[in-house]
């Protein structure tokens, strides 16, 4: 798959013709990502269908995930190439309970509660043909004025992992104190990349949803409540100060 773009022009038979150039390396082996999934579930109903639910467990593995890998120049024209080489695994449980607590000629109340949890991890970042120098890379970006990454993607760790210096206090002079790799509290300016650590994860581990529908003659009322639990939020603005 080649990508071309116009760049300049040249004179041909007395006419100026726009020139085309390749803007990224061609990868003839580029293909769709593959997903393999194992799923087992249970559906149940009692009381004439007024109470029921489902339970579903799955293991999902995504292979041949896409990423830009470094390649030598030459023989390639550009230093990176989009290729299928990564692999990720997800495991999860989904539970739904539905009920009709009240059902009369004039009024009906339907309700359902759902819960889901999912855990994922990076299984591989390299293949036989495309590889990285290490089993991780940094991603995410805060922009001005800090200019630093915010996440790490590493084999064996989940997607969405926050990675950086762990702030623990501020000195009387207003300088940041952080925790180094030995667990000591030192000035931020005295640290290096080896002192960075996992700070949390921005992807919720648990979701809970409660939906209610009320029917009274020709009127309907729906109320839905949804919650996400077991995650951290990156205070992007506070990182500036």
Please annotate each region the language model reported.
Residues 1-146, 150:
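Extracellular/periplasmic, surface-exposed regions of secreted and cell-surface proteins
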Residues 11-46, 52, 139-224:
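Outer-membrane beta-barrel transmembrane strand signature
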Residues 56-59, 223-229:
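Active-site proximal loops enriched in glycine and acidic residues that flank catalytic Cys/His/Asp
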Residues 62-63, 186-187, 230-232:
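A short local loop/turn or secondary-structure capping micro-motif enriched for an aromatic residue
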Residues 99-103, 216-218, 227-229:
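Beta-strand elements of well-folded, non-transmembrane domains
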Residues 228-241:
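Extracytoplasmic gating/loop element in the C-terminal half of outer-membrane beta-barrel translocons
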């Amino acid at each position: 798959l080649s990508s071309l773009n116009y760049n300049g022009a040249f004179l041909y038979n007395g006419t100026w013709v726009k020139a085309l150039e390749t803007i990224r390396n061609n990868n003839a082996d580029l293909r769709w990502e593959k997903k393999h999934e194992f799923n087992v579930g249970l559906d149940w109903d009692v009381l004439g269908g007024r109470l029921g639910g489902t339970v579903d467990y799955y293991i999902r593995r995504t292979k041949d995930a896409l990423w830009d890998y470094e390649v030598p120049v030459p023989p390639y024209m550009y230093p990176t190439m989009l290729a299928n080489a990564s692999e990720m695994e997800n495991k999860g449980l989904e539970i739904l309970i539905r009920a009709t607590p009240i059902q009369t000629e004039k009024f009906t109340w339907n309700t359902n509660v759902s819960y889901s949890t999912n855990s994922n991890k990076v299984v591989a970042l390299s293949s036989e043909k495309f590889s990285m120098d290490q089993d991780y890379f940094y991603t995410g970006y805060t922009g001005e004025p800090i200019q630093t990454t915010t996440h790490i993607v590493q084999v064996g760790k989940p997607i969405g992992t926050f990675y950086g210096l762990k702030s623990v206090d501020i000195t009387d002079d207003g300088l940041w104190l952080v925790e180094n790799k030995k667990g000591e509290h030192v000035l931020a300016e005295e640290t290096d990349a080896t002192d960075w650590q996992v700070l949390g994860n921005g992807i919720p581990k648990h979701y809970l949803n409660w939906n209610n529908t009320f029917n009274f003659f020709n009127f309907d009322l729906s109320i839905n409540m949804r919650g996400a639990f077991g995650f951290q939020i990156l205070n992007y603005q506070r990182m500036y100060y």
